[in-house]
Swiss-Prot record:
Pfam families assigned: ATP-synt_ab, ATP-synt_ab_N, ATP-synt_VA_C, Synthase_beta
Binding site for ATP: G227, G228, A229, G230, V231, G232, K233, T234
Record region (Disordered): 15-35
Subunit description: F-type ATPases have 2 components, CF(1) - the catalytic core - and CF(0) - the membrane proton channel. CF(1) has five subunits: alpha(3), beta(3), gamma(1), delta(1), epsilon(1). CF(0) has three main subunits: a, b and c.
PANTHER family listed in its UniProt record: ATP SYNTHASE, ATP SYNTHASE SUBUNIT BETA, MITOCHONDRIAL
An individual GO BP term: proton motive force-driven ATP synthesis
Organism: Oryza sativa subsp. japonica (Rice)
Gene that produces this protein: ATPB
EC top class, as a word: translocase
Name under which the protein is recorded: ATP synthase subunit beta, mitochondrial
């Protein structure tokens, strides 16, 4: 009893010291939309008006340390100023006396030596929110003031981003000055509604023979790009950017998610050399925008940089009606970064240590990549497979979203055949007679059949030699070797290295050329005449040139 009386007196004393509790916040209407949906719907309008300012003005110095700031929006709490309560690595807890920000709202730390953006991830109760930092938190201290911007992370979009490199929060990192534009969009947006999406299946002609013939890309589809180091992945990506710009007038966006800084720098330099990116007065003629979040960045930045790149691509699709190419390198790092964020937030891990929201995180990104009635976003995603285990949850979840796979083979690159696309391992949902037509489908299957038969005969050739093969098998091998070399192609972006002019091959020409090889029309031509050319007319011309040189 004495203990109970002592506790009661302590509680009463604490209540007197604490004073009257603050008045409860007024309740809104009963049928208020969900916070995330409300935030998505109004973010674009708010961003256009408010996000053009680099940062909202800080609260007056005379205000209280734990509050202050003029609230300009009752729902989002825009303008409210809170206080940092706890910093644990990339996780920062912030308390707001009023103007509590909704989930996914961007906060900006005031009076900091660099611009530090935090994104609200959890509401902890007692006016406390848990946030993920988009940059390093070195130098951040308890009590520092934090501004509620009232909108998600908002980035510049439009033609001003072409030829520029920016980070996850839209800041330029190429030392070429500010990105001057009036167009801004939040990175968190809803996927296009069903009524806005185009259901017609069309192929995106790339001008690359091996891709268009054997594993065609769907307009608005998602393509997985598999390949190790040094097999020509970067050159293939740059040629796709170049060809889409020339043939379709479209732009490209490259999102570097959690990859090496050196590779990002090399890609930028190679794009400048090949003319994909132009500097100085001709910058407006650039064909690609770059968004980087390298592997040295905090997990919050790596988890959101893919969304930043996608937002830039969405503007080109929706506002300008473009066919946009979106490159994501590497989509596995996006999943990996979200797994780190999930662990930092204290969520219980799922299979193989991945976040329990793995499918939701990936689906939120992939479902925004689609074709609408205005334009399309076709995504090429480099995919790292951990320990070459295709059943790992990260790549396995990614495969469910892909429409085509392009596999780059080291064995083919060792033969000097570029692009080193494996014609047997690469697949596409578009390889159907209902989509491509009977001629294209039959030609593609015929090419694959000849190459597969050649692959089956290689062991016999290695042991016994060509002389032991039947006449039919010798003919199969001869045609397969010609097809293998005919799948090579000089690229425009490689002209500066090879000296050979690049070739863009129309789809119809590719189909007719390979059908002629299958029918035996060109059995008399030497196989070296099929190497590094465009259409079949060039093969004939090259064969005549070789014959003249041999005769002389």
């Amino acid at each position: 009893m004495a203990t109970r009386r002592a506790l009661s007196s302590l509680v009463r004393a604490a209540s007197r010291l604490r004073g009257a509790s603050p008045a409860p916040r007024p309740r809104g209407p009963l049928h208020r939309p969900s916070p995330s949906g409300y935030l998505f719907n109004r973010a674009a309008a708010y961003a256009t008006a408010a996000a053009a300012k680099e940062a909202a003005p800080p609260a007056p110095a005379t205000g209280k340390a734990t509050g202050g700031g003029k609230i300009t929006d009752e729902f989002t709490g825009a303008g409210a100023v809170g206080q940092v309560c706890q910093v644990i690595g990339a996780v920062v807890d912030v308390r707001f006396d009023e103007g509590l920000p909704p989930i996914l709202t961007a906060l900006e730390v005031l009076d900091h030596n660099i611009r530090l953006v935090l994104e609200v991830a959890q509401h902890l109760g007692e006016n406390m929110v848990r946030t993920i930092a988009m940059d390093g938190t070195e130098g951040l201290v308890r009590g520092q003031r934090v501004l509620n911007t009232g909108s998600p992370i908002t980035v510049p979009v439009g033609r001003a981003t072409l030829g520029r490199i920016m980070n996850v929060i839209g800041e330029p990192i190429d030392e070429k000055g500010d990105i001057t534009t009036n167009h801004f969009l939040p990175i968190h947006r809803e996927a296009p509604a069903f009524v806005e999406q185009a259901t017609e299946q069309q192929i995106l002609v790339t001008g690359i023979k091996v891709v268009d013939l054997l594993a065609p890309y769907q307009r608005g589809g998602k393509i997985g790009l598999f390949g190790g180091a040094g097999v020509g992945k970067t050159v293939l990506i740059m040629e796709l950017i170049n060809n889409v710009a020339k043939a379709h007038g479209g732009f490209s966006v490259f999102a570097g998610v959690g990859e090496r800084t050196r590779e990002g720098n090399d890609l930028y330099r190679e794009m400048i050399e090949s003319g994909v990116i132009k500097l100085g007065d001709k910058q407006s003629e650039s064909k690609c925008a770059l968004v980087y979040g390298q592997m040295n960045e905090p997990p919050g930045a790596r988890a959101r940089v893919g969304l930043t790149g996608l937002t830039v691509a969405e503007h080109f699709r929706d506002a300008e009606g473009q066919d946009v190419l979106l490159f994501i390198d590497n989509i596995f790092r996006f999943t990996q970064a979200n797994s780190e964020v999930s662990a930092l937030l204290g969520r219980i891990p799922s299979a193989v240590g991945y976040q329990p929201t793995l499918a939701t995180d990936l689906g939120g990104l992939q479902e925004r990549i689609t074709t609408t009635k205005k334009g399309s976003i076709t995504s090429v995603q480099a995919i790292y497979v951990p320990a070459d285990d295709l059943t790992d949850p990260a790549p396995a979840t990614t495969f469910a979203h892909l429409d085509a796979t392009t596999v780059l083979s080291r064995q083919i690159s060792e033969l000097g055949i570029y692009p080193a696309v494996d014609p047997l391992d690469s697949t596409s949902r578009m390889l159907s007679p209902h989509v491509l037509g009977e001629d294209h489908y039959n030609t593609a299957r015929g090419v694959q059949k000849v190459l597969q038969n050649y692959k089956n005969l290689q062991d016999i050739i290695a042991i016994l030699g060509m002389d032991e093969l039947s006449e039919d098998d010798k003919l199969t091998v001869a045609r397969a070797r010609k097809i293998q070399r005919f799948l090579s192609q000089p690229f425009h972006v490689a002209e500066v290295f090879t000296g050979a002019p690049g070739k863009y091959v129309e789809l119809k020409e590719s189909v007719n050329s390979f059908q002629g090889v299958l029918d035996g029309k060109y059995d008399d031509l030497p196989e070296q005449s099929f190497y590094m050319v465009g259409g079949i007319e060039e093969v004939i011309a090259k064969a005549e040139k070789i014959a003249k040189e041999s005769a002389s």
